[in-house]
């Protein structure tokens, strides 16, 4: 039965792959439990925090930081960043030279081409403490030696902290370094933003020659960040920039993504404010999908109106320069209008400006929502002519934002809107994504409540995959029934208007049912699920309900057990821990407070299909459940996997008498899993308070996943922690062990563990800085690979060279997988047909051709097996010579 379940885990896989998976599972069963190979990379002598961060590059190499590394002497905490091959062989080491340089303490940034950047904001430049440095490093060869101005971008003054505010990677692969604390001569914290090439980096001291810089004290250029545009360009936000005697006018500076922007910030190269404290670019610069952008300046002054606010449209190819005004921006006209405070981006590239604080001719805070074109923007004063507005003080139209629909249209939420009779009835207004909507909010253009405090749309609007939407109004009143709640379906092409009612909504029937209070979850197939954990079943309070709705027509009427899955006991609160949508359209309901017939708070995780949903009561027949009081299965939610499967997190699950051992349970995305949690179907802890899965489950792109359990005890070492690689087929069950996990060795240090995954090699790298090591975990039977021949050696330029490698397995015949040979000069070849030479030995070979003389380094790697683990060879040096033909016909070197 287990084999059948595991063989059908991934919908759409080919028959041949399923057959191979069957064989792999059968072989593993024949040889015992699943195996894994582990290889420990220990920190070099002097290491103090080796493994603080671990990053896997696209080529499989590993970057490991050790910011507390001590140089010989010792010189304490100079820091180091190392590059390793996937097999654990060290390629290079970059380190600091002065005490407390802490190279790599700012983190590692991986570029799209695989090169990476090392941030060292505490690096010392001579007498300048914390000058800071950012070092560009090749993904293949790394860099060895000390950080310096010759290999890094560096600061020149104490406290410059180059790179301290991050690095923005542009869409074209280049990057921008932000250093707001950089000093420009005597101008302390003038700030600098430096462009770097993604292929060659940037080095030397920061200056106006290579960077965009401020010129006044505390300009702090770039402090609000750098926004990458979709076309490769970028925009720098500097709200504290001073224009001469005008303090904090702010600036937003356009940068060319191919060459960068350099020199001093000014009105000639930037959008700037016209008054002190305008703080242009205060919060953000927002990138539009087409490459254009918007600058938010909610504190901009309009004449005598302080903080009227402005939102400015900028071209993604040329930017926008000069002073903010009503001619180039959408602006407010009353004090504290704060126009530009919030913006919603539509799926078609247009945008909506949300101004809930806007006042209309003395009527305070009526609110306004203004449509803008993504190609031309919108300018002028906010008004009823260009905006959807409220009619009464404190209507605050748009105060809860907008919902963006897949059709390109949008929905405005205004729960504080008042009708003619009552306050806070609320309104939800549909708007066209090509032309917007203007005028007053009313029942003619909006879905509205009917009673005071209904606050229509207060809990949110959920956009469905097919473009339609669902409005959540948990405080809606049904006649005399207070807070019955409602979930209302709306068309994504025309919206819905008028009053909420049982005729157009799914509603509660008892006071405080608050239908929709938990959530409305959009499924991948366009349908949806309404979560109402406070719903009452007759006189039994808070049993909870989760109701399925069709994405084409919605769901109306009262919630009941006939149209919803419900609890049966008080405070079951079905769905309280959320509903998780799977990528295949199905879903899983987490209800940690569910009681079985005999056990309180056993908890349940209920699988349902996205085509028809599920109704009736929760039970062990339709759900994964706990067995003991307080198991609270699903209490930490459900993690969806990339292949449509899922993992249920239950760190409070008891393993028999072992309290809070914890469990992580794999579920099939097509059929789910039901019955009691156990070691037979879950990864489990073996000691009290192991709390397996409490610290997260991370989904990987290939359908596998990583379980983090910081509270796991390694024998007598408490809270040593474990990081588990769960395979895409759900085969990782039972107790945590070295066969499935990387285990910690130091008490109470699991929070410092860091992991990185390599999908090509199926290798999990876990940094354990408290142990000064990185552990490489490779599922499968251990192997060892060696290059045994390169014939001929040396070879002539253009001559085929046959490379051979031998793979030795600790167990089982080698029947699958492939070996790739890769030269440091870029040549590569692959052999995917193993030739058996002994019981557990196979040979692989293929041909490389070198077209230039010289020596190259060649490595081999074994990957792609369902049974055996990855391994890599040591490097083999091969020489190629240029052959000359003499007049007599003989060849020579």
Segment roles from a protein language model:
Residues 16-31:
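Bacterial N-terminal signal peptides
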Residues 7, 13, 46, 60, ...:
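Intrinsically disordered, low-complexity segments enriched in proline/serine/threonine
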Residues 12, 31, 889-891:
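Short hotspots in intrinsically disordered terminal tails
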Residues 9, 65, 110, 178, ...:
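Selective for proline/serine-rich intrinsically disordered segments
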Residues 30-780:
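Conserved beta-strand/short-helix segments
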Residues 779-892:
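Solvent-exposed beta-strand/loop surfaces, strongest in extracytoplasmic domains of secreted
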Residues 1-17:
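N-terminal secretory signal peptides that target proteins for export/translocation
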């Amino acid at each position: 039965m287990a084999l059948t379940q595991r063989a059908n885990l991934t919908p759409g896989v080919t028959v041949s792959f399923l057959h191979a998976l069957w064989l792999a599972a059968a072989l593993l069963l024949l040889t015992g439990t699943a195996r894994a190979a582990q290889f420990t990379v220990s920190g070099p002598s002097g290491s103090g925090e080796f493994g603080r961060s671990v990053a896997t590059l696209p080529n499989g190499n590993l970057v490991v930081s050790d910011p507390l590394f001590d140089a010989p002497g010792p010189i304490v905490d100079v820091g180091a960043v190392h590059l390793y091959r996937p097999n654990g062989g060290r390629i290079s080491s970059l380190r600091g030279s002065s005490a407390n340089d802490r190279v790599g303490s700012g983190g590692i940034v991986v570029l799209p081409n695989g090169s990476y950047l090392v941030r060292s904001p505490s690096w010392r430049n001579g007498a300048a403490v914390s000058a800071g440095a950012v070092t560009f490093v090749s993904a293949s060869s790394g860099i060895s030696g000390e950080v310096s101005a010759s290999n890094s971008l560096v600061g020149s003054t104490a406290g410059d902290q180059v790179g301290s505010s991050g690095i923005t990677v542009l869409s074209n692969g280049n990057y921008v370094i932000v250093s707001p604390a950089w000093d420009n001569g005597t101008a302390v914290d003038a700030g600098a933003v430096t462009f770097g090439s993604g292929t060659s980096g940037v080095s030397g001291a920061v200056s106006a020659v290579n960077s965009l810089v401020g010129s006044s004290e505390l300009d702090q250029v770039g402090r609000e960040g750098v926004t990458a545009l979709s076309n490769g360009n970028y925009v720098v936000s500097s709200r504290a920039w001073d224009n001469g005697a005008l303090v904090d006018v702010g600036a937003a500076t356009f940068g060319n993504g191919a060459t960068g922007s350099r020199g001093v910030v000014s009105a000639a190269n930037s959008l700037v404010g016209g008054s002190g404290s305008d703080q242009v670019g205060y919060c953000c610069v927002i990138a539009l999908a087409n490459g254009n952008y918007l600058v938010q300046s909610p504190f901009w002054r309009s004449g005598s109106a302080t903080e009227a606010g402005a939102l400015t449209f900028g071209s993604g190819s040329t930017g926008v320069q000069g002073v903010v005004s009503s001619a180039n921006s959408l602006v407010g006209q009353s004090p504290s209008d704060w126009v530009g405070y919030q913006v919603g981006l539509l799926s078609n590239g247009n945008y909506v400006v949300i101004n809930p604080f806007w006042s209309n001719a003395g009527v305070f805070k009526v609110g306004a929502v203004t449509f803008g074109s993504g190609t031309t923007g919108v300018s002028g004063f906010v008004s009823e002519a260009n905006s959807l507005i409220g009619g009464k003080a404190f209507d605050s139209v748009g105060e809860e934002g907008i919902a963006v629909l897949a059709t390109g249209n949008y929905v405005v939420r205004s729960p504080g809107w008042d009708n003619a009779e009552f306050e806070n009835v609320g309104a939800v207004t549909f708007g066209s994504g090509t032309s917007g909507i203007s005028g007053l909010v009313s029942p003619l253009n909006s879905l509205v409540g009917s009673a005071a405090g209904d606050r229509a749309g207060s809990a949110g609007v959920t956009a469905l995959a097919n473009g339609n939407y669902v409005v959540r109004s948990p405080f809606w009143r049904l006649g005399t029934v207070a807070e019955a709640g409602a979930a209302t379906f709306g068309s994504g092409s025309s919206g819905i208007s008028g009053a909420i009612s049982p005729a157009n909504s799914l509603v509660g029937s008892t006071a405080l049912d608050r239908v929709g209070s938990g959530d409305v979850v959009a499924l991948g197939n366009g349908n949806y699920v309404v979560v109402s954990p406070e719903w009452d079943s007759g006189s039994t309070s808070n049993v909870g309900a989760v109701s399925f709705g069709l994405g084409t027509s919605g769901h109306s009427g009262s919630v009941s057990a006939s149209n919803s899955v419900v609890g049966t006991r008080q405070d079951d609160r079905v769905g309280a821990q959320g509903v998780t949508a799977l990528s295949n359209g199905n879903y899983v309901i987490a209800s940690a407070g569910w009681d079985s017939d005999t056990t309180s708070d056993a908890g349940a995780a209920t699988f349902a299909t996205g085509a028809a949903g599920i109704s009736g009561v929760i039970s062990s027949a339709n759900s994964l459940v706990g067995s003991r009081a307080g198991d609270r299965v699903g209490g930490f939610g459900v993690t969806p996997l990339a292949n449509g499967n899922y993992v249920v997190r239950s760190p409070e699950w008891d393993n028999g008498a072992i309290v809070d051992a914890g469990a992580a349970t794999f579920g099939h995305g097509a059929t789910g899993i039901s019955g009691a949690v156990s070691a037979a179907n879950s990864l489990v802890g073996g000691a009290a308070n192991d709390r397996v899965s409490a610290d997260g489950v991370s989904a990987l792109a290939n359908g596998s996943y990583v379980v983090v359990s910081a509270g796991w005890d390694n024998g007598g070492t408490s809270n040593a922690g474990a990081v588990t690689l769960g395979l895409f087929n759900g085969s990782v069950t039972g107790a945590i062990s070295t066969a499935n996990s990387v285990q910690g060795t130091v008490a109470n240090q699991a929070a410092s563990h860091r992991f990185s995954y390599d999908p090509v090699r199926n290798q999990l790298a876990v940094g354990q800085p408290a142990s000064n090591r990185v552990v490489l975990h490779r599922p499968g039977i251990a192997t060892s690979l060696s290059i045994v021949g390169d014939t001929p050696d040396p070879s002539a330029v253009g001559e085929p060279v046959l490379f051979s490698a031998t793979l030795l397995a600790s167990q089982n015949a080698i029947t699958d997988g492939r070996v790739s040979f890769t030269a440091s000069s870029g040549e590569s070849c692959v052999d995917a047909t193993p030739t058996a030479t002994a019981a557990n030995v196979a040979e692989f070979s293929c041909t490389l051709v070198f077209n230039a003389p010289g020596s190259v380094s060649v490595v081999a790697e074994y990957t792609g097996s369902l049974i055996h683990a990855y391994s890599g060879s040591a490097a083999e040096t091969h020489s190629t010579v240029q052959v000359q033909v003499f007049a007599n016909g003989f060849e020579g070197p």
